[in-house]
């Protein structure tokens, strides 16, 4: 048999085996539920912690914080490129994470499912800011919601669900806010911060 034919066959077979193994692994682990998201946030230490912002603009300074009902999506997809330069996640994990990032666009956080969180209507907040502009919109917002707000992404898990990527941002005015993307690893029944990237503060 021609040597080039054999080489091509081996390459094709290897690629087929990899994709089949990946699909099989994903199908076995593709059982992430909405409850998994809530369990993560309810067993995770604050991703920041915040040391540079005080009073009502420090998300750690209040017992009950506001959370926008619509999970953050786009920023997390962009930030994973930096995280994936590390060796924390395997190639199969990365493919699985990308697959998860395309789902749950219609998910809305539910009231009472996360400890210490008051879920507020993301569409209403967006309407306030869009219709009045942020300079006028923030005073209108505060009259209704009293405190600044958090935005969380859903956690994106590794195949074995022992590691995940999650984004959190906090805004309290036109001039103050912060956020970053984090990698967490599960130790016992707690999620512990492993790595942070792409932080921003304004």
How should each PLM-predicted stretch be described?
Residues 161-187:
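Exposed beta-sheet edge and beta->alpha loop/turn motif
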Residues 182-201:
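Short beta-strand edge/turn micro-motifs at domain boundaries
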Residues 1-33:
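Bacterial Sec-dependent N-terminal signal peptides
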């Amino acid at each position: 048999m021609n040597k080039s034919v054999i080489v091509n066959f081996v390459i094709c077979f290897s690629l087929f085996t990899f994709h089949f193994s990946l699909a099989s692994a994903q199908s076995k682990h593709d059982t992430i539920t909405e409850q998994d998201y809530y369990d993560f946030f309810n067993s995770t230490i604050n991703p920041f912690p915040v040391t540079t912002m005080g009073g009502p603009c420090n998300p750690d300074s209040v017992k009950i914080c506001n959370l926008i009902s619509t999970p953050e999506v786009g920023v997390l997809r962009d930030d994973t490129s930096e995280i994936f330069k590390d060796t924390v996640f395997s190639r199969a994990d990365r493919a699985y994470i990308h697959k998860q990032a395309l789902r749950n666009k219609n998910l809305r956080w539910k009231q009472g499912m996360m400890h210490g969180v008051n879920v507020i209507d993301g569409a209403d907040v967006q309407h306030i800011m869009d219709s009045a502009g942020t300079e006028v919109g923030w005073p209108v917002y505060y009259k209704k919601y009293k405190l600044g707000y958090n935005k969380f992404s859903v956690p994106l898990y590794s195949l074995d669900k022992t590691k995940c990527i999650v984004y959190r941002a906090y805004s309290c005015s036109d001039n103050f806010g912060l956020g970053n993307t984090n990698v967490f690893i599960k130790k016992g029944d707690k999620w512990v911060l492993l790595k942070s990237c792409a932080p921003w503060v304004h």
